[in-house]
């Protein structure tokens, strides 16, 4: 279910303070563990280092990302492809 409009978008307080102190268009990368924070229009032009559980993934925020969560742009799982079918390998030989 979507968040109520009267509540507004959720942004962690510590992240909002970092963004306000940094200013728009800064080259400095803002390191954050807050994957749950919603991207607001003041984030446009900033680069965040979003933690994916193992390392920090750089995410440059554009206009199209507004309204999404930071965690959507830092995948936590690595897909190596589906396992090969043993029967089809034996049949080909």
Swiss-Prot record:
Record has Disulfide bond as a keyword: no
Stretches assigned to coiled coil: none
GO cellular component entries: cytoplasm; small ribosomal subunit
InterPro entries for this protein: Ribosomal_uS19, Ribosomal_uS19_bac-type, Ribosomal_uS19_CS, Ribosomal_uS19_SF
Domain of life: Bacteria
Entry keywords, A to Z: Ribonucleoprotein, Ribosomal protein, RNA-binding, rRNA-binding
GO BP field: ribosomal small subunit assembly; translation
A GO MF label: structural constituent of ribosome
The family this protein is said to belong to: Belongs to the universal ribosomal protein uS19 family.
HAMAP family hit by this protein: Ribosomal_uS19 (MF_00531)
Function, as annotated: Protein S19 forms a complex with S13 that binds strongly to the 16S ribosomal RNA.
Protein name, per record: Small ribosomal subunit protein uS19
Organism the protein comes from: Geobacter metallireducens (strain ATCC 53774 / DSM 7210 / GS-15)
